[in-house]
């Protein structure tokens, strides 16, 4: 009878709790906290060893920044646009632009013209002749391609560059003449180069078109005569004779077709060696010239016998 009585069922959670091990059941929160703390301490020790290892390495040398450097903060410039200063602006200008600026300033302020003239360096022979050659190059480049270069059509095409060259030649020449130029060698050097430029002027088939070229020769001949006369007053014309100017001027006269004959005659008269019917003292002048040559060459008196003994 009693065996037929059913045993009351046991709840399922009692069976689950019975599976846990005693050690699991006996673990307390304090033991879990201590294990976590020990693990954190081990991690901190490992990090400390890792951070300290480079310092103890012999290859690492700590560098200390200066105290003043650490306190200085790099200033950030305030970037903004501004115009160039006058010296930097002048560096960017080429010759033509700078010349235009100076000319414009002198036109606006006439009182600056004298200041510019006195401040500017005096032009030399080489720079002046180069300016004239530039005008000459512009003239040559203005000729039409093909056709007759001596025709009226070619003359009309190059008339303006030709006028520019002749005007420049007329303006520059007085600057190298006495009394503005006191050195005869400088004047003669300029006239030598300027005469070569006139030789290179084109010849035209129409005689009327050659009037400008002939006028340039006439002005150049007068300039030669003026310089020769002034040079003859200094040292008896020694610089004219021993500079080879007699030969240079004779060659210029030949190239010009005799248009510089007046200058050749003036040079011959100044040196005293001109051969012509209108020089009555030709023999005396030749003798004086011969003595002068011997004096400068150091051969004077070499052929004269020297007396020995009482005079």
From Swiss-Prot:
Sequence segments annotated as region (Disordered): 1-83
Q: What is this protein called?
A: Tethering factor for nuclear proteasome sts1
Annotated GO biological processes are: nuclear protein quality control by the ubiquitin-proteasome system; proteasome localization; protein transport
The UniProt entry's sequence similarity note says: Belongs to the cut8/STS1 family.
Quote the biased-composition stretches of kind Low complexity, using this chain's numbering: 18-34
Keyword list, A-Z: Cytoplasm, Nucleus, Protein transport, Transport
Q: Where in the cell is it found?
A: Cytoplasm; Nucleus
């Amino acid at each position: 009878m009693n065996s037929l009585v059913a045993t009351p069922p046991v709840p399922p959670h009692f069976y689950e709790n019975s599976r846990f091990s005693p050690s699991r059941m006996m673990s307390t929160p304090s033991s879990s906290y201590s294990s976590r703390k020990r693990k954190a301490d081990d991690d901190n020790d490992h990090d400390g060893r890792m951070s300290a290892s480079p310092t103890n390495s012999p290859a690492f040398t700590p560098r200390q920044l200066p105290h003043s450097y650490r306190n200085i903060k790099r200033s950030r410039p305030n970037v903004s646009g501004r115009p160039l200063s006058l010296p930097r602006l002048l560096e960017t200008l080429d010759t033509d632009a700078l010349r235009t600026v100076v000319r414009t300033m002198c036109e606006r302020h006439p009182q600056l013209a004298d200041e510019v003239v006195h401040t500017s360096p005096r032009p030399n022979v080489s720079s002046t002749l180069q300016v004239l050659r530039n005008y000459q190059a512009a003239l040559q480049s203005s000729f039409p391609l093909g056709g007759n270069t001596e025709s009226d059509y070619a003359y009309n095409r190059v008339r303006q560059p030709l006028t520019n060259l002749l005007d420049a030649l007329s303006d520059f020449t007085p600057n190298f003449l006495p009394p503005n130029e006191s050195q005869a060698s400088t004047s003669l050097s300029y006239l030598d180069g300027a005469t070569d430029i006139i030789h290179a002027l084109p010849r035209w088939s129409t005689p009327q078109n050659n009037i400008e070229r002939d006028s340039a020769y006439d002005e150049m001949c007068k300039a030669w005569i003026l310089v020769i006369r002034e040079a003859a007053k200094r040292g008896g014309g020694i610089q004219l004779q021993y500079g080879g100017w007699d030969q240079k001027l004779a060659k210029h006269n030949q190239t010009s077709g005799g248009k510089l004959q007046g200058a050749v005659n003036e040079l011959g008269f100044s040196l005293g060696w001109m051969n012509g019917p209108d020089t009555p003292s030709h023999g005396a002048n030749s003798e004086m010239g011969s003595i002068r040559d011997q004096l400068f060459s150091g051969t004077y008196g070499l052929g004269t016998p020297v007396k020995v003994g009482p005079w």
